[in-house]
Each structure stands twice: as C-alpha cells, then as structure tokens.
Amino acid sequence: MVPKLFTSQICLLLLLGLMGVEGSLHARPPQFTRAQWFAIQHISLNPPRCTIAMRVINNYRWRCKNQNTFLRTTFANVVNVCGNQSIRCPHNRTLNNCHQSRFRVPLLHCDLINPGAQNISNCRYADRPGRRFYVVACDNRDPRDSPRYPVVPVHLDATI
C-alpha cells in the first residue's frame, strides 16, 4: 500500500509540474504588459521573413511558437479598432471585449514547419502573406502602459 501511495503522489507531482510548464509556455514574459506583449508578437510595419521575425518571440518563450500573425500596421491603428463596437470573440467565445477592424490590412502569417526543433535557433517557418480583417480583444491599459491610450489591444483573436 505504501509504494502505491508514494507512486501516486509522485505521479500527481509530475502531472502538476507538467501542467505548470505547459501553462508557462503560453504565458507572456512578466516584464511586459499585455499590450506590450501584443505589440511585440503582432505589430510590424515591415516584418522580415517569418523565420527571422519569429526569433524575437521565440527568444522570450524559449521554444518555437507554432504559429503567429504579424499585422502590417501601427499600434495606434490597432488601438483605434478598440473603439469599434464590442463583439463576442470568435475564438474565445467567453470573451465579449473583441473588436473587428473595418478595413483589411496586409499581414504576414507564420507557420512552424519543423515542430520537432529542440533549439529555438533551429525554428523554421513558412511565410503566408495576406490581406485580411482582424479581431482584437481590448482592455483598459496597465499602469505600466503609456497613458496615451486608455484602452489597448491585448490579444489577436482572429483574422478574417
């Protein structure tokens, strides 16, 4: 009985540890506000090819992100979208703080093509340029954000 209890406790600890690691892989780096991390991940007027552009994000995450979209617009333009009518977020249906752009913007979507890469310097991506509408979730700014924008984008929910 004691070995079974001990084994089950170790399994539980391992499972909780793995869940913590998995959760941390999706978390933003603590030195950034949600709006700052949004800008790093999704705003670039002229992104280089995906493999190069994704290095910045992957260096903070310590792993190869499966996919990402860069909007070829300014942060101020995305902030303006936060002023559009609120809608239910298409991919996070529990959220009602999303807003859809009124105009298509050029974008660059990046897809990881070697998911087994063990080192972030080996992450390789396929480039998929396009022109689409986008949906962002917006929240009140963090005290660490610029007071210039009281409401800021914090999540790219969809491109349409």
UniProtKB/Swiss-Prot annotation:
It is an enzyme of class 3 (hydrolase). One of its GO terms (molecular function) is RNA nuclease activity. The active site is at 42 (proton acceptor), 155 (proton donor). Substrate binds at residues 65-69. Disulfide bonds join 50-110, 64-123, 82-138, 89-98. Residues 28-72 are annotated as: Required for nearly all of the bactericidal activities. Its EC number is 3.1.27.-. One of its GO terms (cellular component) is extracellular space. Interacts with bacterial lipopolysaccharide (LPS) and lipoteichoic acid (LTA). In vitro interacts with phospholipid bilayers. This is Eosinophil cationic protein. Glycans are attached at residues 84, 92, 119. Cytotoxin and helminthotoxin with low-efficiency ribonuclease activity. Possesses a wide variety of biological activities. Exhibits antibacterial activity. Keywords: Disulfide bond, Endonuclease, Glycoprotein, Hydrolase, Nitration, Nuclease, Secreted, Signal. Belongs to the pancreatic ribonuclease family.
